[in-house]
Amino acid sequence: PRGIILCGETQSAKGVLDAQILSLGIPVLALGHAAHMLIAAMGGACAGVAISEKKAAIQYEKTRLFADVEGGERYLEETLVLMLPADVQVTASAGGCTIAFEDSRRSLYGIQFELERNDPDSSTILKNFARDICGCSPWFTMDAALAQARQKLSDASIEGGYAVCGVS
């Protein structure tokens, strides 16, 4: 893979991130509670709740991940106090609390909120991660996917010469 995106649902589903993922040499973006697991795997720690279930004004640093993302209010469900390792930088904050962080040398990124589908910044952040950080290209369209599937089927040796392909 060219990159990994980790998402976590609830604090009650506490898990431990296998630190070997960090040594694969591919970019990792951890969202929500997965960001807490990432910071722990990087040698940092999480403490008590800093912001809980309220809107907060977020300021973003001009980084590759947050290129073209403007600061503004966002609802934050649960934001913890983070103790960052020495080589990790704060890339977004709200009221003095770390909201996002990165280790740009190892391409490890964490954001303490989930990306919502109706938030225009979410698609920008995902695009920045996929294209600018992971080096992926936006080749996928339904026509391209169908052409690729047809090519794979025609390259395969199908007995009788017919195949049924369902797309959902």
Which residue stretches match the model-derived regions?
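RNA-binding accessory domains that recognize and position tRNA/RNA substrates
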Residues: P1-L6, V16, L22-L24, A40-S168
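Short glycine-rich anion-binding loops that position phosphate/pyrophosphate groups of nucleotides
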Residues: G8-S12
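Short alpha-beta junction capping motif
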Residues: K14-A35
